[in-house]
Structures are given as structure tokens and as C-alpha cells.
From Swiss-Prot:
InterPro entries assigned: Cyclin, Cyclin-like_dom, Cyclin-like_sf, Cyclin_A/B-like, Cyclin_C-dom, Cyclin_N, Cyclins_cyclin-box
GO cellular component: cytoplasm; nucleus
Subunit structure comment from the entry: Interacts with FZR2/CCS52A1, FZR1/CCS52A2 and FZR3/CCS52B.
Annotated family: Belongs to the cyclin family. Cyclin AB subfamily.
Region forming the signal peptide: none
Protein name: Cyclin-A1-1
GO BP field: cell division; mitotic cell cycle phase transition
Length: 460
């Protein structure tokens, strides 16, 4: 297995570090949709646990290049435009995905008054419209909307959890007091009125959307935990190069584990499952999700477009289209806010450290035994301890909002501490390299103490 890991890292490194090729924009010449010159042959990043490159099948495919985004991980261009449209590109530069104007027919003739714009054709004659240059009217409407903005009053929840009447009198945080992190009701995006209800719903839902903790031993025959780690490590690099939001990565791993919990898969299809799950998660979370051709591209065209789409369909149907799943990142966002306190400036280093620890947990199959909320709370505990080993990392505010006592975190914190301590010698360096950058405050280079005092786990 060590040879597999070494081969995988050297292969991936050569494909993504020294010879990372960016896709080029289509040319406006007569050969605008012709394939660009063949690039140097690269082995698929996960070729040692996947099937061989399907170069022979690709020679017969009519796929051509596209320039949607540029990403270092890509090794070959993606498909965007059908070659049959090449003759039309000389006369029209209209994007192929843009809907036709309602004022024009298929043959290009005008079907209504040419002086009337296509946008005007959608206007209802029964509604009075405000022109863009009527500034006073727009300002008046905005002022009226703001004056009528109403945020529902706070209400108590069951068992006085997050009771506003109790927290409203607590202004400062010490070992016996709780900071009200939901006091900023002036920002509607914080959903402060419903924050506690949302958290309770997430805690109830996480048990229903969790994968089996023993599926490797019980279900899988050709795939093991090491291969899973290699796949997740590669997907972390993919998400970083494509600049995907963290939620996409966490959902991707959740979909992979849930699918593997009930479906036997061969190692040749493991990378296919990974890119299909990432494509689903990207569609769910991203504003501009990568196209299916791009996911074929990042595998060095190991899989055809139809294969990725078929796997996507299999995953969606097996998961019954239940794509909303509470992940560690969902809980971590709120727990970081609780760790900061309402009156403290956001501590970027603490947030980066907690995110680093949480992403390390994605690589480890055994961490599935811990719930996402427990991993998030433990990541906050360990992050605070690493940044300041002299202070007790847990307090009443964190206990209140996470609903975990310090003693309940002990097992998970120990597992995360082990991951942090061995990260520098790990053969899966994607997370460490990611968080060794300046934009993440170099948190991966922080020293992780090997021992945490027992009294820090005593409930205060």
C-alpha cells in the first residue's frame, strides 16, 4: 500500500504541479471548434486505483474543447460546443446556452415590432413599470420597504434552550456566564430568531443522513479505507484548484460514504464515484458549478461523459434525492461564532485552525464513528487549545450552544489530536499543504501538543 500511495502522489504531483495546463478559449477562425494540439500524455491522478485511460474510446468521440474556467488540475480540455455548429460561429457569436429572443423566429425574421425590445415583450400592460433613470421613485420604494421591515420577536424554546429572556441580561462572558451570540437581530441574514430552531433541526437530521460506520468491513470487497483516503485527498485538491466552497467538499464526502454504505463498488469505479458526487454537490452549493466535461477532464479522461452521468443518476436514485445533509461545516460555522463571542472581533486564526482540523477528519475513515456536530465541537476545542495551551478551551457559552460538555468531547478530541500530530508525516498532504498558505494563516504549521491536561475535560 505504501508503494501505491507513493506512486499516486508522484503521479498526481507531476500532473498538477509542474505540468498543469489551462484550457484555452475557442478560436474565432474557421477552425474554432477544432481540437487543440494534443498535449503530453498524463496518467490519471488515481490510475493506481482506477481503470486504465480510455484513450481508444476518446478517439472516436466527437468531443471538443471549451473555455469555461481555468484550473490547474485539468490535464485536457473539456467539451463545450458540438462540432456541427462550426459553420454558424462565423455569423453569430451568441452564446449557445442563451435562449432565443421572443421577437425573432427560427429563420431569423422579425415576428413583432422591431422597435419593441425583447425585454419589453415580457412586460404586462396591467403593471406600471419604473424606468431605470427614475431615481427618486426607486429611492422612495427602498425607503418604504425598509420602514416596513419587520423581524418577528424572539420566543422561548422547549426546555429554555437558547431562551432569549435568560440570555438578554448576560452582557459579558466568564466561566459562569453565557454570551448571547444571537443578539444581533439587526442582520436578517443571521436568522437570529430561528437560529436555535435551525440548530435543533440539524442535530435531529444528522443521525438520518449519516453513513454506516462499518461499511468497509461489511459491504466493500475491493475498496479499503486507504483507497478512500487517497480519493478524498485528491478531491480536496480538486476543490481547492476549482475554488469550490467548503460545503461542496463536505457534501461530496458525505455522498460518497452514504453510497458506499449500501453499494459494492470496484476500485476501478472509485474515482468515478468521487467526481460524480462532487458534481452533484457542486450543483447543490455552487453558483457556477463545473460542467460534466470538466469532471471528465480532471480524471485525465479516464471516464466518458456518459459514464459520469450514469454514476450521477445511480447516486441520486440510491440517496432518493435527499441531498441536504448536515455536515461538520454546517455546525462549525455556528460554533466558531460561539467561540468568538458576540463582542469579540472575529479571530481568523481560530477559524482557520478549526477548519483545518475538521478537513483532516475527512481523510480518516474511522472518524465516521463521530457525528458531524461532535467533530465540529471537538475541532473548536482542539483549535483553541493549540492556539493557547494555557487557557481552558471550553466554557459555558460553547457548552450551551454546542450542547456538548467537555467530557463528552474527550474521545473525539483525542482522535483529532492524533491526526494533527501525524499530519506532517502523512502520505496524504492535501489538507496540510492547503492550510500552510498565508491566506489560511499558516495554521498547518502550528505545533500540536501531544498531551491535553485532563482537567480541561472536566465539566465547569
Amino acid at each position: 500500500m505504501s508503494n501505491i500511495l507513493q506512486n499516486r502522489r508522484s503521479s498526481f504531483s507531476s500532473s498538477t504541479k509542474s505540468s498543469l495546463a489551462k484550457r484555452q478559449a475557442p478560436s474565432s477562425s474557421e477552425n474554432s471548434v477544432k481540437l487543440m494540439p494534443a498535449m503530453t500524455k498524463k496518467r490519471a491522478p488515481l490510475s493506481n486505483i482506477t481503470n486504465q485511460k480510455i484513450a481508444s474510446r476518446l478517439q472516436n468521440s466527437d468531443s471538443v474543447h471549451c473555455s469555461n474556467k481555468s484550473a490547474k488540475l485539468k490535464i485536457a480540455p473539456s467539451v463545450c460546443v458540438n462540432a456541427s455548429f462550426s459553420s454558424n460561429l462565423q455569423q453569430s457569436i451568441v452564446p449557445h446556452k442563451v435562449a432565443s429572443s421572443p421577437s425573432k423566429s427560427d429563420d431569423g425574421s422579425v415576428s413583432m415590432d422591431e422597435t419593441r425590445s425583447s425585454s419589453d415583450s415580457y412586460k404586462s400592460p396591467q403593471v406600471e413599470y419604473i424606468e431605470n433613470d427614475d431615481v427618486s421613485a426607486v429611492v422612495s420604494i427602498e425607503r418604504k420597504a425598509l420602514s416596513n421591515l419587520f423581524i418577528t420577536p424572539n420566543s422561548e424554546t422547549i426546555d429554555n434552550y437558547c431562551s432569549r429572556d435568560v440570555l438578554s441580561d448576560m452582557k459579558k462572558m466568564d466561566k459562569n456566564q453565557i454570551v448571547n451570540i444571537d443578539s444581533n437581530n439587526g442582520d436578517p441574514q443571521l436568522c437570529a430568531t430561528f437560529a436555535c430552531d435551525i440548530y435543533k433541526h440539524l442535530r435531529a437530521s444528522e443521525a438520518k443522513k449519516r453513513p454506516d460506520v462499518d461499511y468497509m468491513e461489511r459491504v466493500q470487497k475491493d475498496v479499503n479505507s486507504s483507497m478512500r483516503g487517497i480519493l478524498v485527498d485528491w478531491l480536496i485538491e480538486v476543490s481547492e484548484e476549482y475554488r469550490l466552497v467548503p460545503e461542496t467538499l463536505y457534501l461530496t464526502v458525505n455522498y460518497i460514504d452514504r453510497y458506499l454504505s449500501g453499494n459494492v463498488i470496484s476500485r476501478q469505479k472509485l474515482q468515478l464515484l468521487g467526481v460524480a458526487c462532487m458534481m452533484i454537490a457542486a450543483k447543490y452549493e455552487e453558483i457556477c458549478a463545473p460542467q460534466v466535461e470538466e469532471f471528465c477532464y480532471i480524471t485525465d479522461n479516464t471516464y466518458l461523459k456518459d459514464e459520469v452521468l450514469d454514476m450521477e443518476s445511480d447516486v441520486l436514485n440510491y440517496l432518493k434525492f435527499e441531498m441536504t445533509a448536515p455536515t461538520t461545516k454546517c455546525f462549525l460555522r455556528r460554533f466558531v461564532r460561539a467561540a468568538h463571542g458576540v463582542h469579540e472581533a472575529p479571530l481568523m486564526q481560530l477559524e482557520c485552525m478549526a477548519n483545518y482540523i475538521a478537513e483532516l477528519s475527512l481523510l480518516e475513515y474511522t472518524m465516521l464513528s463521530h457525528s458531524p456536530s461532535l467533530v465540529a465541537a471537538s475541532a473548536i476545542f482542539l483549535a483553541k487549545y493549540i492556539l493557547d495551551p494555557t487557557r481552558r478551551p471550553w466554557n459555558s457559552t460553547l457548552q450551551h450552544y454546542t450542547q456538548y460538555k467537555a467530557m463528552e468531547l474527550r474521545g473525539c478530541v483525542k482522535d483529532l489530536q492524533r491526526l494533527c500530530s501525524t499530519a506532517h508525516g502523512s502520505t496524504l498532504p492535501a489538507v496540510r499543504e492547503k492550510y500552510s498558505q498565508h491566506k489560511y494563516k499558516f495554521v498547518a504549521k502550528k505545533f500540536c501538543p501531544s498531551v491535553i491536561p485532563q482537567e480541561f475535560f472536566n465539566n465547569s
